[in-house]
Design a protein with these regions (language model features):
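Extracytoplasmic beta-strand/coil segments of soluble accessory domains associated
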Residues: 2-45, 63
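Short acidic/polar hinge/loop motifs at secondary-structure boundaries
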Residues: 41-69
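Transmembrane beta-barrel wall of Gram-negative outer-membrane proteins
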Residues: 106-135, 140-175
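Transmembrane beta-barrel architecture of outer-membrane proteins
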Residues: 18, 52, 79-81, 97, ...
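Short beta-strands and strand-coil junctions in structured, solvent-facing domains, enriched
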Residues: 8-10, 31, 43-45, 71-75, ...
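Short strand-turn segments of transmembrane beta-barrel domains in outer membranes
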Residues: 64, 71-74, 82-120, 131, ...
C-alpha cells in the first residue's frame, strides 16, 4: 500500500482482524468508502445500503491487491473510494507439487494465532488452501475474540486462455 498514493489503512480494534482502508479525504472505518471484494466477489455486508466490510482476508494468503479508482471504478459499485479486490493465492505461484507453510504466534493476553497453508501444481492443476485460527482474551474488558477461517481453491488450466476453477471459503468470528 505504500506505493499507492493517497491510500491509508487503519486498524481499529487492536486485533488485526478488520483492517479499514480509504483514499485521501475519506473515512477508513471498515472500508465503507470502497467496494471491497475477494477474488472478484463482493464481501461487504450490503454493497448499496450498508457497505461495511466486517471481514478482511488473511494477509498471508493475499497474492496481490487490486485497486481501481476514479471513473473506472463505477462499473463495480457506487462507493466514492473505488474498488478494492483482495486476490488470494491459488497455487499458480508455487513451482512444486506440494508446499506446506505454517506461521504460529503466541503472546500476552491469551493471544494465539496459527496459519497453515498447503499448495502446489500437478501438470495443469494448481491448488491452494489454508486454515487460520486466531484468538485472544483482549487487552481490555470485553475484548475477547476467536476467529476461524478456511479457504481452498482448485484450478485446471484447459488452455492458455481457459481456466476452470472451484473455491470454497468459510469464516467464523466470535467476539
Amino acid at each position: 500500500m505504500a506505493k499507492v498514493p493517497g491510500i491509508h489503512t487503519w486498524e481499529s480494534d487492536g486485533s488485526g482482524i478488520q483492517i479499514g482502508m480509504a483514499t485521501r479525504g475519506l473515512s477508513p472505518n471498515r472500508s465503507w468508502e470502497f467496494n471491497v471484494r475477494q477474488n472478484g466477489y463482493d464481501i461487504s455486508s450490503d454493497p448499496f445500503g450498508y457497505p461495511e466490510a466486517y471481514y478482511t482476508p488473511q494477509l498471508q494468503a493475499v497474492q496481490r491487491l487490486q485497486i481501481v479508482r476514479g471513473a473506472g471504478a463505477l462499473q463495480y459499485g457506487p462507493q466514492f473510494g473505488g474498488m478494492l479486490n483482495f486476490i488470494l493465492r491459488d497455487g499458480s505461484d508455487i513451482q512444486k507439487s506440494i508446499e506446506l507453510e505454517t506461521q504460529n504466534t503466541a503472546g500476552s493476553f491469551g493471544l494465539f494465532n496459527s496459519y497453515t497453508a498447503i499448495g502446489g501444481q500437478l501438470n495443469k492443476v494448481h491448488y491452494y488452501g489454508f486454515y487460520d485460527h486466531r484468538q485472544a482474551d483482549g487487552w481490555r474488558e470485553n475484548g475477547r475474540y476467536k476467529v476461524r477461517t478456511g479457504f481452498t481453491t482448485v484450478n485446471y488450466q484447459v488452455s492458455p486462455k481457459l481456466k476452470l476453477g472451484f473455491e470454497l471459503m468459510r469464516w467464523n468470528m466470535r467476539s
